Design a protein with these regions (language model features):
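Short, basic-rich loop-to-helix N-cap that marks the start of a DNA-contacting helix
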Residues: 59-73
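A short, Lys/Arg-rich alpha-helix, primarily the initiator
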Residues: 2-41, 135
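Short, charged recognition helix plus adjacent turn
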Residues: 3-7, 14, 18, 82-138
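Recognition helix of helix-turn-helix/homeodomain-like DNA-binding domains
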Residues: 44-63
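Histidine kinase transmitter module recognition
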Residues: 31-34, 59-60, 113
């Protein structure tokens, strides 16, 4: 282990990862239940394995910080698209106001979990950047 990296795989690191996985997993599950996206769409568009999506939804602590970072883009992408569709009447919903209130609440939770990373993702989406293309660049 290199100098300065002794915290990795420590109890503190595992504890932190567990807390973050719990929050991200719950938000992802809520998005899937509310039909904002599906595991199949996530797999097709972002290349995330079904097993990874399942583990995150079940809040398994074996999920790495790299996966957590990847899902910052995934969650931000689908939340932004859904909010935009409902706001602009591009998606037919029974109760538009309650749907928007729920989406705004999810967006705030997303920003609380991911902080500055969430702000960057949402700004990229607002600027019309193709997030899927950006994710696939090497």
């Amino acid at each position: 282990m290199g100098k300065g990296r002794s915290y990795m795989n420590s109890y503190a690191d595992g504890y932190m990862r567990g807390k973050v996985v719990k929050e991200v997993g719950a938000l992802l599950e809520h998005m899937i239940v509310e039909e904002i996206t599906t595991p199949t769409i996530i797999n097709l568009e972002f290349g995330s394995a079904y097993d990874t999506i399942r583990k995150l939804r079940q809040q398994e602590t074996s999920i790495s910080f790299e996966i957590i970072r990847q899902f910052c883009y995934v969650i931000g992408y689908y939340l932004y698209k859904e909010i935009e569709a409902v706001e602009n009447y591009k998606k037919d919903v029974r109760n538009r106001e309650s749907r928007l209130a729920m989406l705004y609440e999810m967006k705030e939770k997303y920003k609380k979990i991911y902080g500055m990373q969430a702000v960057v993702v949402l700004n990229l989406m607002h600027q019309g950047k193709d997030l899927l293309a950006l994710m696939k660049r090497v």
